Amino acid sequence: MRLSMRRALLAAGLALALVLAVHLGQRVLECQAVLGGPRGPRRTMRPEQEDLMMVGADHVEYRYGKAMPLIFVGGVPRSGTTLMRAMLDAHPEVRCGEETRIIPRVLAMRQAWSKSGREKLRLDEAGVTDEVLDAAMQAFILEVIAKHGEPARVLCNKDPFTLKSSVYLSRLFPNSKFLLMVRDGRASVHSMITRKVTIAGFDLSSYRDCLTKWNKAIEVMYAQCMEVGRDKCLPVYYEQLVLHPRRSLKVILDFLGIAWSDAVLHHEDLIGKPGGVSLSKIERSTDQVIKPVNLEALSKWTGHIPGDVLRDMAQIAPMLARLGYDPYANPPNYGNPDPIVINNTHRVLKGDYKTPANLKGYFQVNLNSTSSHLGSS
């Protein structure tokens, strides 16, 4: 099993390297043509004006470029990123779609090239400057986001670990906005462990280790969010989104500059429908977001974390207190839910919501296997 997984990762890495090589090769040739050859006089390149054009099923033409207001949704896995993107997908003007998985990998590679002084020197010597790399990254990311789903007026990407690169992405796409999903780390970690959601570097046999890694990841993402600025990055608390969906979504849509639609409150009604919410058959959150917003998962972690970890919680995960959570509250008081959420929860517990026909036969396989969310450390 390990060998086949390594081979799969190696194959994915080689494929990714090939795609990037093609993009970079094109950019280098363009640069050399504009700059007068590989050793010609250096001049500032003209900014590209080319847009990506797509035609929707309604025969409407959509044009996408680096100046468009992209939306990036991210956070530590198991923090409500799938729920958030499903709600946005329910909006008639927005399309997020499933995780691409490839965008955070590409961003991690770009970061690695920048951190290595020797590698950067080699790239610069070869004419693969930061300008060339950034143009290639911009084109590649936009192409993946635009073409992995149906076109829409507003495009959104949900890959949890992309928000470790918010500052860089805001440079590539200056009008983009970011939604950082924040959830009580104890709940996120309990969900990872019980649902066996493997994440690079997280030891799923240890609450202490996972909480330490959660703290490190959310610290990086939160710092990036603050650096980008409150006008471009909005922390969204999962608990408040669940308890008060209408109030929270009004704030979110106002922040994004998108008109209100009641459809965002009923994402479960639009699953699998044209122009609605497309769900992956293999993502671990799919079996949860087919249901309406409910309280089922809010405090499931209470009573499961070892006593020694609870005792040291403030030291293990100092970001809990920084984000406004009481590290010693067990169970915590997140607030009182809206009546609609209470009603939804009663209906979910009664079993009113069934798996859509197009998704049946996959969840049991998923729950008995592992799923990797790879993030740069």
UniProtKB/Swiss-Prot annotation:
The active site is at residue 99. Keywords: Disulfide bond, Glycoprotein, Golgi apparatus, Membrane, Signal-anchor, Transferase, Transmembrane, Transmembrane helix. GO terms for biological process: peptidyl-tyrosine sulfation. Its EC number is 2.8.2.20. Residues 1-8 are cytoplasmic. GO terms for molecular function: protein-tyrosine sulfotransferase activity. It comes from the Eukaryota. N-glycosylated. Pfam families: Sulfotransfer_3. Residues 26-377 are lumenal. It is found in: Golgi apparatus membrane. Its main location: Golgi. The chain crosses the membrane at residues 9-25. Residues 101-105 are annotated as: Interaction with peptide substrate. The record marks 158, 285 as: Transition state stabilizer. InterPro entries: P-loop_NTPase, TPST-like. It is an enzyme of class 2 (transferase). It is a single-pass type II membrane protein. It catalyses: L-tyrosyl-[protein] + 3'-phosphoadenylyl sulfate = O-sulfo-L-tyrosine-[protein] + adenosine 3',5'-bisphosphate + H(+). Disulfide bonds join 96-156, 225-233. Substrate peptides must be flexible in order to adopt an L-shaped conformation in the deep binding cleft. Belongs to the protein sulfotransferase family. Homodimer. Can also form heterodimers with TPST1. Catalyzes the O-sulfation of tyrosine residues within acidic motifs of polypeptides, using 3'-phosphoadenylyl sulfate (PAPS) as cosubstrate. This is Protein-tyrosine sulfotransferase 2. The gene is TPST2.
